[in-house]
Amino acid sequence: MRRQPKTHAFASLCLALLCLGGLALAPVVPAAAQDAGLYDAPIPADAGFVRILAGDGRAGATVQIEDRTLTTGADGVSPYLIFKAGRYPAGETEIAVAAGSFTTLVLGADGRLQTLADEPLASPKASGIHVYNLSALPAVTLFAPEFGRAVVEDVASGTTKGRAFGEGALVLEVRAGDRSLAAFPKRSINRRQAVSVIVTGPADAPRAVLVDNTVVRR
């Protein structure tokens, strides 16, 4: 079989990005949760999704929201939990959960929370990548080295950017200028699946992880 030229493959990727470029990101529900969803009640229309992310990438960080505790896993991020729309005390602050919203609470080393909004996917045909720059680096870029192109560019410190596209497989690399910070093996991102690339740490020793966005029903 004739191998597809890289230029043609990249053109296909660009077309997918352009067609779905106005869409943003949503978490993927694990297979077990999808199976359980055949019998569970549907997610209420007035519900939103909230997760926490440790600004220093640590596992075991917690935030209490009413009677529920969100805890970061090994990669420094928790699953999304489902909350009815409304206002909730969280740590020393208050968060607003809107219907259909996706919120990431960034927990700083001082215990303070920063709220970042992640827009949901607007199409069942979309998949996506979200990049969080929680490091001391002024900006980071997510790069596709196979194609020599940026996927998500110039994510400033303390902010997040995302991009939606058609399903596919990519090798991904995190860069700060010409400096390579981390590279991830080729992986497939399927329809209605989203992943997060999280960069933390000091400018001279940053850490980058790639995680699936997940939802827990409880």
Predicted regions and their residues:
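N-terminal secretory signal peptides that target proteins for export/translocation
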Residues: 1-10
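Short linear motifs in intrinsically disordered/low-complexity regions
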Residues: 9, 22-23, 213-214
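C-terminal segment of classical bacterial N-terminal signal peptides
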Residues: 20-30
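Intrinsically disordered, low-complexity polar regions and short flexible loop motifs
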Residues: 32-218
